Amino acid sequence: MTAQILDGKTLAQQFEQEMRLRVDVLKAKANGHTPILATILVGADPASATYVKMKGNACQRVGMESVAIELSEETTTAQLLAKIDELNNNQDVHGILLQHPVPAQIDERACFDAISLEKDVDGVTCLGFGRMSMGEAAYGCATPKGIMRLLEHYQVELEGKHAVVVGRSAILGKPMAMMMLEANATVTICHSRTQNLPELVKQADIVVGAVGKPEFIKADWIKDGAVVVDAGFHPERCGDIELAPLVDRVAAYTPVPGGVGPMTINTLIFQTLQSGEKAFG
């Protein structure tokens, strides 16, 4: 069996070309103004700084602007909330990204939820998640939404299929399950307390690795002909799924790197563009 590669890197590049055309149209209509993404980085974590830079570069590639706000490691919850409130009230800003994780003294959930729904382009607020869960309009969490866009492009059928999501985080596993449920898949969510995890994964037509541990999901847990989506990325340049033994016996898979990651960033930028289009009418 020759597996289909769900190439997120190439798809993101294609989407960027389409987005640039939309940005050009918007700028012509808005007297040269363009959507602006504000990124907030608290502390000096090198990986987080790299991710923020990548998001700024992606904005630039499609003709949008980004504003990078860097706060000290000692920033308090109150100080961060004040900065978010300032950005909420800045009509020139169309999207707000608070880079995860923040220092331990900060109430991250409170700060996520302080982002206005209209500017929650990373899909991290409880209000946005609740609306999405009820089938109402809201920006989706960037990684699961990026996965859905990837699966849609490659025409991976979800309706009637059994999807197993391994991981239940608030910004990945849970919204991933809800989006797949909305697409009429039958969804099982697994986590660290799940019993008989290998047996459950073996039942899956579609497996989503969202557990945050390198190659935690073993190749022999996955049945022939399944679709494998790996949302993990680790310093060893591997994901959450033991991928190498699978490439000759699954129907399709996301490579690591080059699969889910580029689509996460692309979705963040796309949703910022959508926010800008709404703001400019």
UniProtKB/Swiss-Prot annotation:
NADP(+) binds at residues 167-169, 192. Keywords: Amino-acid biosynthesis, Histidine biosynthesis, Hydrolase, Methionine biosynthesis, Multifunctional enzyme, NADP, One-carbon metabolism, Oxidoreductase, Purine biosynthesis. SUPFAM superfamilies: Aminoacid dehydrogenase-like, N-terminal domain (SSF53223), NAD(P)-binding Rossmann-fold domains (SSF51735). It catalyses: (6R)-5,10-methylene-5,6,7,8-tetrahydrofolate + NADP(+) = (6R)-5,10-methenyltetrahydrofolate + NADPH; (6R)-5,10-methenyltetrahydrofolate + H2O = (6R)-10-formyltetrahydrofolate + H(+). Pathway: One-carbon metabolism; tetrahydrofolate interconversion. One of its GO terms (cellular component) is cytosol. Pfam families: THF_DHG_CYH, THF_DHG_CYH_C. Its EC number is 1.5.1.5, 3.5.4.9. The keyword Acyltransferase does not apply. The keyword Membrane does not apply. Belongs to the tetrahydrofolate dehydrogenase/cyclohydrolase family. PANTHER family: C-1-TETRAHYDROFOLATE SYNTHASE, CYTOPLASMIC, C-1-TETRAHYDROFOLATE SYNTHASE, CYTOPLASMIC-RELATED. Catalyzes the oxidation of 5,10-methylenetetrahydrofolate to 5,10-methenyltetrahydrofolate and then the hydrolysis of 5,10-methenyltetrahydrofolate to 10-formyltetrahydrofolate. Homodimer. This is Bifunctional protein FolD. The gene is folD.
